[in-house]
Amino acid sequence: MNFQEEEFVLLRNTIDGQKRLIDYVDTPKTTEYRNNLIKINSEYALHWFDLRIKNVEVSKLAARLERDETTLPIDLSKRFLYRIFTQGSFKKGGRFYRGWWQNVPKEYRPYITIDEGFTSEYDYSQLNPHMLYYSMNKEMGEEDAYSRVLDGEHRDIVKQAFNAMIQADTQLRACPENIDIDKIDISWIDLRERILTAHKPIASLFFQGTGNAMQFEDSQIVENILLQTTDSKTPALPIHDSFIMRQQYASDLEEMMRRAFHSRFGEDIPVSSEIIIEPPRLFEDDGTPRTDEMAVEDREHSQWFDR
């Protein structure tokens, strides 16, 4: 790929009810975004990102993704990032997309490797709620932003509803199609009101189309982190509010994330981490080589080794 000729900064708008890419006139800021992406992607080109799963799992995963209309197949050649801005504005959206790892289901992400090395994933805890509260100069408190709504139950559904209410520019009288309200024993209207009650300090931000502006804020944080990891030649792979990085550099990533958020909001945010999987043991506790076991391991992952 010729990075100088590829357009990495894209602008979308809704036209006749359809999201479409639109042309735009360059500004110093769009040129900066593009140059930063060229820098990030040029570093990515020096590394190899892969998925270390057993051969028998490869076809299973491919079939699963094919059945899911919301996901794309995993194509390891899709190694570079693009920024997509929304609503015809370079102050809306701006998240980083099109890296193949963003299509990997959560339970498979532990097996993402960078330069054949095992990885860890770090993520911001409740990024959207924290940004919203800080934007209003309010403290969110220690209690989980989603669990507080239904006394700890149905957290995933509450999170979906919370984000839908922040994204919407209407009052959302009807439940969004992607939320399975039948899983809980209250109506959509009741859930909506409970979220508003639980988050009175930021109630004015719901139903105002705030979500795309918040996406721009988190995309600026992501850019900050990606530029730092590019400078240190230790690439990190973004998945919205989380990052995947080789395990030996993970502690550096955590500090980068804290600094990047603080530089944007002047406040701190919890960062959670997970050492995802441990490399296979080459030796027994007594020092005996695990030759037979490693031979089996190699055969089971031969497609990964062959790449």
What are these model-derived regions, one by one?
Residues D123-Y124, P235-R246:
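Catalytic palm active-site di-aspartate
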Residues M214-Q220:
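Surface segments flanking catalytic/ligand-binding clefts of nucleic-acid enzymes
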